[in-house]
Regions:
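N-terminal Rossmann NAD(P)H-binding glycine-rich loop of SDR-like oxidoreductase domains
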Residues: 3-25
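NAD(P)H-binding glycine-rich loop region in Rossmannoid oxidoreductase-like domains
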Residues: 32-96, 100
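Mid/C-terminal beta-alpha module of Rossmann-like enzyme folds, strongest
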Residues: 2, 15, 211, 215-251
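Glycine-rich "substrate-gating" loop/helix at the edge of Rossmann-like oxidoreductase active sites
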Residues: 136-141, 168-175, 195-203
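Conserved Rossmann-fold NAD(P)-dependent oxidoreductase catalytic core, especially the SDR/UDP-sugar
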Residues: 82-140
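Alpha-helical substrate-binding/gating segment
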Residues: 182-190, 197-230
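Conserved beta-loop-beta element that borders a ligand/cofactor-binding pocket
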Residues: 117-118, 150-173
Length: 251
């Protein structure tokens, strides 16, 4: 299958490219710089420089592909994440770029589109929830993900297969926020996401990449991509502390 991938040098994009190439797919990967293009080409993909906000450029790049995988995001670092303005480019990618990619995929006759999204369900305590039972309740910084999901639904409504992957919080080697959490844990200040009883669902980036590849053969719809054990924030912080062999000084 000829697969067009955006966000190819991101947290999930890097392992996804490797898995797609290993599975025998012919991969075109979008990069933002010549250096990034060299990285994806070293992984076995064909690298291209494309402005995702330029619909004409996107259409030209997508032509001739069987599937589009949209993993493009611009998530700010933890030190800036509290600023709403820091999410502006990410919002544009989800609102504008996702629409351009769907338009281009439909014009190209591609039969399948995979759209990255995020789990954003309301706090439901220890009750098990998923996309089929619980409506999303996104915070302002992730609300634009719903617009990207709507574009995937538009693709499906056009007689094709649109798959949305709602990922949990990524973790893995080399990810900036993972390194930040571990550094805090070494100082005895383990990360805690909100109230101590609030649950967090996570996903290792390698598993997330495997889900992207599997989505190329999945029915249309929304899928939650998370580990099988969500953790309450307090337990999450304890797990981080244990991982670095430290006790938490603050609770």
């Amino acid at each position: 299958m000829k697969v067009f991938v955006t966000g190819a040098t991101g947290a999930v994009g890097r392992p996804t490219i490797l898995l797609l190439v290993a599975a025998g797919h012919e991969v075109t990967a979008v990069a933002r710089t010549d250096e990034k293009r060299a990285q994806v080409e070293a992984a076995g993909a064909r690298g291209v420089l494309v402005d995702l906000f330029d619909p004409g450029a996107v259409a030209a790049a997508v032509a001739g592909h069987d599937a589009v995988v949209n993993l493009a995001t611009n998530i700010p670092p933890i030190t800036r994440a509290a600023r709403r303005s820091a999410w502006a480019t990410n919002d544009r990618l989800r609102r504008e770029a996702s629409a351009h990619l769907v338009d281009a995929a439909m014009a190209a006759g591609a039969g399948r589109l995979v759209q990255e999204s995020v789990v954003f369900y309301p706090d439901s305590g220890d009750r098990w929830i998923d996309a089929s039972s619980t409506a999303p309740a996104p915070t302002p910084v992730v609300a634009s993900a719903l617009e990207a999901e709507a574009q995937a639904a538009r693709f499906t409504d056009g007689g094709r297969v649109g798959v949305v992957l709602r990922f949990g919080m990524f973790y893995g080697p080399g990810l900036s926020h993972t390194e930040t959490f571990l550094r805090l844990a070494r100082w005895g200040l383990a990360y805690s996401a909100g109230e101590r009883s609030r649950y967090t669902s996570s996903i290792q980036v390698g598993d997330a990449a495997a889900a992207v590849v599997a989505a190329l053969g999945a029915p249309a719809g929304i899928y939650d991509i998370v580990d099988d054990e969500p953790l309450a924030s307090d337990a999450y912080a304890d797990a981080l502390a244990a991982a670095v062999g430290r006790k938490r000084h603050l609770r």
